[in-house]
Amino acid sequence: MPAIRVSRATRALLLSVSLVLIWPAATAAARPAPNSMAVAGDSIARAFNTCWFPYIDCVANSWATGTSSTVNSHYRRILASNTAISGRNSNDAKSGVKMVDLPGQMTKISARNVQYVAADMGGNDICTSTTGAMTSVGSFSADLRTALSTITGNTNVQTVYLTSIPDAYQLWSIFQTNSSARSTWARFTVCQALLANPTSTAQVDVDRRQQVRAHNIELNRAIETVCAEFAAKCVFDGWAIFCTAFATSDITTRDYFHPSTAGQKKFADVSWRAGPFVATPTARLGPDCNPATND
């Protein structure tokens, strides 16, 4: 058999391909640890209902800026490697707010000139009295865009991290058979768009719950999309929080709605591992994830 002649150009190409195949992939670079931070958001960021005294904010337990060693917040994790952030952890979230309130929070935070801004927002935009009262995708996106334009325009701000809205449908799924949860939801009219008539199997109620979950997903898509418009500074959690399963212990039994201290700890851990300060964040997921398999 005659020898096969390989040109110099072909040999060079084969060598380059071989190097690509055998050379280890570069590890994604984590963003530098910030010297200051703040959090915007709603009652989750305020760690509502996690203190010994009920029905108050408990910012020491916040997943983002809290000081509790039990929760091990983003602030504490950063502090462990960068003591310059000590005492520079502002919680500017407010219980009960919606996305329409985020631009105002970001204006306030911008004046602080912090380097890292975390935000969780959107739970109250889906957890309304009726499905008709849920915030539209258009309004939600516009308000988020305004907020991000404000905060990313501050040259001191290096990173803005947005977490996905938790999968609220899980509340119904894990507590629908719990009589205490059902009575609490009814007495305090908790998230009635989703949690009204929790034991009903009537098609109208089944459809209503699915409508809320679908809107939950739509608003998370909006967060992902708008964040990408500010990609130089904005980081989305890749659906990590949405795709995380709740255990009953992760939800406070005071209202069967807000994260317990254990829930804040889980929120902190999941969001940190998916976030901007780790070299290899957890894999990006998506709305088709099954939270039961992504704990």
Please state what every model-predicted region is.
Residues T70-S86, T146-Y161, V204-G238:
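A structural motif corresponding to the C-terminal end of an alpha-helix
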Residues A12-P24:
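Bacterial N-terminal signal peptides
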Residues R31-S69:
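Short glycine-rich His-centered loop
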Residues L171-D295:
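Catalytic His-Asp segment of secreted/periplasmic serine-dependent ester chemistry enzymes
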Residues S36-F48, G87-A93, Q115-D120, D125-C127, ...:
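Structural recognition of the beta-strand scaffold that forms the well-ordered cores
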Residues M1-L14:
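Bacterial N-terminal signal peptides that target proteins for export
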Residues F53-S149:
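Conserved SGNH/GDSL esterase-like catalytic core that processes O-acyl groups on lipids
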Residues W23-P32:
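Bacterial Sec-dependent signal peptides at the C-terminal "C-region" and cleavage site
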